[in-house]
């Protein structure tokens, strides 16, 4: 199987996001890498589902709360930027202050 660097990155994000989701389901708080992976994966999947950049930027602030992440993580993650593939091409999605 031959994967491009971007495809390898997406698989890594998927694996980390899956781990993060399992930990959330068990009631554990997410650390920094898990938080970024979880948010990034939501953007990638939203783009795949046909959502617009503006929809993802708006929804992105509702995916995680401060209660779901370790202390200090919400201050560390002031924005998340993800290049996602949309039907009309690749676009950069930026979510400002994603953890409320």
UniProtKB/Swiss-Prot annotation:
Reactions the enzyme catalyzes: urea + 2 H2O + H(+) = hydrogencarbonate + 2 NH4(+)
UniProt GO cellular component terms: cytoplasm
Principal localisation: cytoplasm
Notes on temperature effects: Optimum temperature is 55 degrees Celsius.
Compartments in which it is found: Cytoplasm
ATP-binding recorded as keyword: no
Xref: HAMAP family: Urease_gamma (MF_00739)
Name the UniProt record assigns to this protein: Urease subunit gamma
Originating gene: ureA
């Amino acid at each position: 199987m031959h994967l491009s660097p971007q495809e390898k990155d997406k698989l890594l994000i998927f694996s980390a996001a899956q781990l993060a989701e399992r930990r959330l389901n068990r009631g554990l708080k997410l650390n920094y890498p898990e938080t970024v992976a979880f948010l990034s994966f939501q953007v990638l999947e939203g783009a795949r589902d046909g959502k617009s950049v503006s929809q993802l930027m708006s929804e992105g602030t509702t995916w995680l709360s401060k209660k779901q992440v370790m202390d200090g993580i919400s201050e560390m993650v002031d924005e998340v930027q993800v290049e996602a593939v949309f039907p009309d091409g690749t676009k950069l999605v930026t979510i400002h202050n994603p953890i409320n």
